[in-house]
């Protein structure tokens, strides 16, 4: 499959279908024989260079013991407040930070404020946005969010990455419904590919998962 700039791609399938494994190949966590970026074999690209362009937000977000500011910048002294505020807004985390005792300087993690699962997920996404990648891969990192927050966050991401590449891995069909392209995996293979409406009509695994999961937000159905 190919992913072009400006495209939102959803990866879905049953548990252990190969979604996360495919995402890991794009970052050279495992060796792949046929992945190219701008027609260049990723095996010929330095890992540090590759990971400066492609950022991956894992299922279990990593929060550092330090301030919100430190978590956004990876403890870098080069802090850009405008970028920080934009990242927090896109990730739907800005209001949470405003309510914290010291704002961006609030200490979180083992030595400070304990964050909920949803807050941890949104902070990890804000950190990725702050790093300004060409490709953002989010691996089932929205599971703790309520439907409205998730919907708004995804729309923010799609707008922000309208000239880049956004890839979201999700077992929850509602998360990626309405994306430009959706790939359905089963047992390590791509079995379906297309937009939501096409896949729904195909009566394949995508359609089956829709029926099993039953509910889609009305806003996403309209897409």
Which residues fall in each region the model found?
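ABC ATPase NBD Q-loop/coupling interface
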Residues: 34-49, 151
């Amino acid at each position: 499959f190919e992913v072009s700039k400006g495209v939102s791609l959803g990866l879905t399938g049953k548990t252990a279908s190969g979604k996360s494994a495919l995402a890991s190949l794009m970052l050279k966590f495992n060796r792949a024989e046929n992945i190219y970026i701008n027609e260049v074999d990723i095996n010929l690209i330095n890992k540090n260079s590759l990971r400066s362009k492609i950022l991956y937000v894992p299922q279990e977000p990593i929060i550092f013991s330090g301030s919100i500011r430190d978590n956004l910048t990876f403890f870098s002294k080069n802090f850009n407040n405008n970028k920080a505020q934009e990242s927090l807004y896109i990730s739907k985390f800005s209001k949470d930070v405003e309510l914290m005792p010291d704002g961006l300087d609030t200490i979180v993690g083992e030595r400070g404020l304990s964050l909920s699962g949803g807050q941890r997920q949104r902070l990890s996404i804000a950190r990725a946005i702050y790093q300004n990648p060409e490709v953002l891969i989010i691996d089932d990192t929205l599971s703790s969010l309520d439907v409205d927050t998730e919907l708004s966050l995804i729309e923010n991401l799609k707008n922000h990455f309208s000239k880049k590449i956004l890839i979201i891995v999700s077992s929850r069909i509602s998360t990626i419904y309405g994306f430009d392209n959706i790939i359905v995996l089963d047992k390590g293979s791509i079995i379906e590919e297309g937009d939501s409406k096409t896949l729904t009509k195909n009566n394949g695994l995508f359609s089956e998962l829709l029926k099993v999961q039953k509910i889609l937000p009305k806003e996403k159905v309209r897409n």
